[in-house]
Amino acid sequence: MLDALTFDAGSTLTPDYMLMLDSRDITGNISDRLMSMTLTDNRGFEADQLDIELNDADGQVGLPVRGAVLTVYIGWKGFALVCKGKFTVDEVEHRGVPDVVTIRARSADFRGTLNSRREGSWHDTTLGAIVEAIASRNRLEASVAPSLAGIKIPHIDQSQESDAKFLTRLAERNGGEVSVKMGKLLFLKAGQGVTASGKKIPQVTITRSDGDRHHFAIADRGAYTGVTAKWLHTKDPKPQKQKVKLKRKKKEKHLRALEHPKAKPVTQKKAPKVPEAREGEYMAGEADNVFALTTVYATKAQAMRAAQAKWDKLQRGVAEFSISLATGRADIYTETPVKVSGFKRVIDEQDWTITKVTHFLNNSGFTTSLELEVRLSDVEYETEDDE
């Protein structure tokens, strides 16, 4: 339930906010003109977005310059406001009649170096070292999940590719999510409910009475039942080929409604250690209808990580759930683990992760809409070699 907000019975909650332009508080300048403020907290490299609509019926609203920095705080009167970060103004609109000014700002300045194409190569390094180097040259502070930072990268090229796209490619290959928030380049494990530093994000409990609308759907997972990735050692002349299959370990308590109809229990086998094959194919899931990754990876480990990352992404999309909270929650962020109650059993029994948060605020109300996906934090894997 919404236990973060406690107030006297019968009292009325009033929305509150503070807006800073560079280092100047301009809240008083816009409070009588504010029509709406929408703040979208996105997962991944899709920048967070701030949209402000101001009434300009008298024509006295000054247009901010592109590149100006807005810092926004939102919440409720009588409670500490929550800082939602810094946003760079990159769009300004004026329309009428009636005359309205729309200011659109994003959490990362994509007119800057993050979006500039670069050439480069990385040799015998780690994922963490690459992220830190890219953060440094973009004047950002890097924060990389420990489980990802130590991943070895024998070689990778960045060819006519922006840092934003290159980091996204690295994240997709290694089961991560990358984003820029409040001056930090975050590289964390997707859907695990932990911060980039490895700390667990406190779980939020939401009851049906907290919201006024919700939507739940189970996706057709029959579209793909598995993922394959190939690897090839170009330095090893031995003509060995190996197939490796990845399957989820059977959990004692698993939500049957979200379980793939072709899922089968697997008996764990301990195979003797053998030299890694020069060439091979790795599969996550079942072989009935397979999504084949087109990239040929340099090592078996890289192929395994890429296939597992893609398979996890497909599995997280097994069900979707969204809810609009009648009472806005400024303290909720993406990647927050959520437990819900008061809905159908299939919804209540599942662990969820927030993938998108949209706050809508004006002078009379404040609501928060959440989009969630299935959380896979407890999933374990085992492999079978098929020589």
What are the language-model segments listed below?
Residues L2-F7, V100-D109, P146-R221:
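Short beta-strand-centered interaction patches in the first periplasmic/extracellular domains
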Residues R33, M37-V65, G211-E387:
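An acidic/polar, Gly/Ser/Thr-rich interaction patch typically located in mid-to-C-terminal regions
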Residues K86, G128-V131, A164-T168, G226, ...:
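Extracytoplasmic/secreted envelope proteins and their assembly/folding machinery
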Residues K86-R95, G120, Q192-V194, D351-N363:
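Short, compositionally biased
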Residues R95-P98, T126-S143, A298-R305:
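Glycine-rich, acidic and aromatic/proline-enriched surface loops and short helix-turn segments
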Residues M1-G112:
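Assembly/oligomerization scaffold segments
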Residues R111-A133, V144-R169, R173, A326-G328, ...:
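Short acidic/polar beta-strand-loop edge motifs in secreted extracellular
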Residues I74-W76, K189, G342:
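Conserved "cap/hinge" positions at secondary-structure junctions
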